């Protein structure tokens, strides 16, 4: 394993490039997973529309097959056939543009802040060597808790920063056929469309389960590090790239199984409008009120039920004080459990596991290949512009590119200044 020191921006650009390539290769699996997570709800909504459009009113909610639809398990093959029948092969790539934009930004932000946070923690834990040489402190590597802390910081920042992009991506993947206008927009236009029609809050729906998903890379890396240490101890050698690939895939497998319910919740919340969420919350409250005895004849039963659940009132009060995004997540989760069962949280898991493992493998490979290239370009640029001694200032690197362009001709310089003014 190489001990070469790489710049933070090198990791960021390599991660973004690796993410673009791996996402492009595995995106049809992403589409199948997203459809599997949300299709039951969409089919249920379609049945409700048919029920409401019934002129003679003979079809009651209880006698309809809505519940059957909500309980019906849809196979991945059926989903694939439906997509190909309705939209053709291009339907497997709905929302690809927004996904590529999202994964590039996510990986860039994640890897940049992961490396920056990790190196900061490393130097603070080794002040005596950090004061003498940066590389001496960094060769020791990060401890498990330092890696987890760096992953938590980087994951939180990247999730919050890119949540609007993934809301738009889910909409463009699932609803591009139903919402024709949305399907014709690019990512930025789709975000603006959602902002104008549903409000800025909608762009951050699913943020709570998204933040829970910060655990995914933390779990993956912890498993990876522990197994790596075990192999090094047993075989008395460093792990090979193939070892790292297999360990990373295994860590991703475990992390995805643990966090998949939150992935499903996030996808459901992305396609669910704010009014629908409010209606669900109101429905739960209405059902609770209607369950109370009307004439006092069931007062004894009510007391008996209250005695069985002495903490029910306390729990209700606690939930009422929670932030609305958390309440929305638990309301949606409870509704899924009640109507569709526990299996609804793991719908599409098999395809997601395949996609996640392949994506992690491709990402690992492409990132390592691009890392040397991006690091060479960035360090050469810094040496040419006199920034070699300040490797962590991204703003200065951007200015260095502008400076290099402005040195070509007065016309180029004018264009650069004008573009900067627009920004």
Curated annotation (Swiss-Prot):
Taxonomic superkingdom: Eukaryota
Membrane topology value: Multi-pass membrane protein
PANTHER family listed in its UniProt record: PEROXISOMAL MEMBRANE PROTEIN PMP34 (PTHR45939:SF5), PEROXISOMAL MEMBRANE PROTEIN PMP34-RELATED (PTHR45939)
UniProt domain comment: Lacks a typical peroxisomal sorting signal.
Keyword Metal-binding part of the UniProt annotation: no
GO MF annotation, one: coenzyme A transmembrane transporter activity
Family to which the UniProt record says this protein belongs: Belongs to the mitochondrial carrier (TC 2.A.29) family.
Residue windows of the Solcar repeats: 6-120, 142-230, 239-373
InterPro entries: Mito/Peroxisomal_Carrier, Mitochondrial_sb/sol_carrier, Mt_carrier_dom_sf
GO cellular component: peroxisomal membrane
Region of interest: Disordered: 43-70, 278-308
Ranges annotated as biased composition (Polar residues): 55-70
Protein's job: May have transport activity.
Residue ranges crossing the lipid bilayer per the database entry: 12-32, 98-118, 148-168, 204-224, 245-265, 353-373
UniProt entry keywords in alphabetical sequence: Membrane, Peroxisome, Repeat, Transmembrane, Transmembrane helix, Transport
Pfam families on file: Mito_carr
SUPFAM superfamilies on file: Mitochondrial carrier
Compartments reported by the entry: Peroxisome membrane
Basic and acidic residues bias locations: 43-53
Protein name: Peroxisomal membrane protein PMP47A
């Amino acid at each position: 394993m190489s001990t070469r020191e790489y710049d933070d921006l090198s990791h960021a650009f390599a991660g973004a490039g690796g993410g673009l390539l791996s996402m492009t290769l595995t995106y049809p699996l992403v589409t199948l997973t997203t459809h599997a997570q949300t299709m039951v709800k969409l089919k249920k909504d379609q049945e409700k529309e048919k029920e409401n459009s019934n002129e003679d009113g003979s079809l009651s909610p209880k006698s309809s097959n809505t519940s059957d639809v909500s309980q019906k398990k849809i196979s991945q093959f059926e989903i694939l056939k439906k997509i190909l029948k309705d939209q053709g092969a291009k339907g497997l790539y709905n929302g690809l543009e927004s996904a590529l934009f999202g994964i590039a930004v996510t990986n860039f932000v994640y890897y940049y802040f992961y490396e920056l946070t990790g190196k900061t923690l490393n130097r603070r834990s080794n002040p005596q060597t950090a004061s003498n040489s940066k590389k001496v402190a960094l060769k020791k590597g990060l401890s498990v808790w330092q890696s987890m802390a760096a992953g938590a910081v980087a994951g939180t920042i990247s999730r919050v920063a890119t949540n609007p992009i993934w809301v738009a991506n889910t909409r463009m993947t699932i609803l591009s056929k139903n919402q024709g206008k949305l399907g014709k927009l690019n990512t930025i236009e789709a975000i603006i469309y959602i902002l104008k029609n549903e409000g800025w809050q909608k762009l951050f729906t699913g943020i709570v389960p998204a933040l829970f998903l910060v655990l995914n890379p933390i779990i993956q890396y912890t498993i990876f590090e522990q197994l790596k240490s075990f192999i090094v101890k047993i075989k008395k050698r460093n792990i090979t790239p193939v070892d790292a690939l297999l360990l990373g895939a295994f860590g991703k497998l475990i992390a995805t199984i643990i966090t998949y319910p939150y992935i499903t919740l996030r996808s459901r919340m992305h396609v669910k409008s704010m009014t629908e969420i409010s209606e669900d919350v109101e429905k739960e409250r209405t059902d609770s009120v209607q369950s109370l005895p009307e004439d006092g004849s069931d007062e004894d039963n009510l007391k008996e039920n209250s005695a069985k659940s002495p903490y029910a009132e306390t729990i209700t009060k606690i939930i009422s004080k929670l932030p609305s995004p958390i309440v929305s997540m638990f309301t949606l989760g409870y509704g899924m459990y009640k109507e569709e069962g526990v299996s609804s949280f793991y719908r599409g898991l098999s395809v997601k596991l395949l996609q996640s493992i392949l994506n992690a493998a491709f990402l690992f490979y492409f990132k390592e290949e691009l890392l040397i290239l991006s690091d060479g370009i960035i360090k050469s640029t810094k040496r040419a512009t006199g920034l070699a001694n300040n490797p962590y200032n991204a703003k200065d690197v951007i200015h260095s590119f502008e400076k290099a362009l402005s040195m070509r001709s007065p016309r180029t310089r004018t264009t650069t200044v004008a573009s900067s003014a627009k920004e």
